Amino acid sequence: MKKTYVVDTNVILYSPNAILSFEENDVIIPEVVLEELDSFKKDKSDLGANARYAARLIDKLRKQGKLNEGIDLENGGKLRVEMNHHDTQMPASWNKEKADNRILQVCKGLKEQGEDVWLITKDIFLRIKADAVDINVEDYYEKFVPEYDRSEERRVGKEC
């Protein structure tokens, strides 16, 4: 069964090519992740470099179709930016303006639509919260990274 991987900001900042590494599955970038990436673009560190690389990569893919409908990837998967699920119920005590909670809200909304949703994040607290609201969750690590990406440095300095 095809999986739907929702990718957290920290995964893209860690490895901008991560969005290409989920084989023939769907990859979702919640709109709040784009907002968070945008906040890193002027950073002079590796995080800033990776945010800029990710922006160029997503922009390059955007030219192949509509991100809100999904863009076919070379590996058979599909990339999509998700802007919906603002009305999906979350625990009343959770601040819906907090980025992590918005990401979880997107995951929950997609799950309620029948998708096999997996949140991929390097954030341990987000993994704990995902588990608390019954969202499948995994850390991003080597099993997702294609062979060609394993030898690259974490800072990506070349153009897409």
What are these regions (language model features)?
Residues 157-160:
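Positively charged, low-complexity/disordered segments
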Residues 3-118, 124-155:
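Active-site-proximal, substrate-binding regions of enzyme catalytic domains
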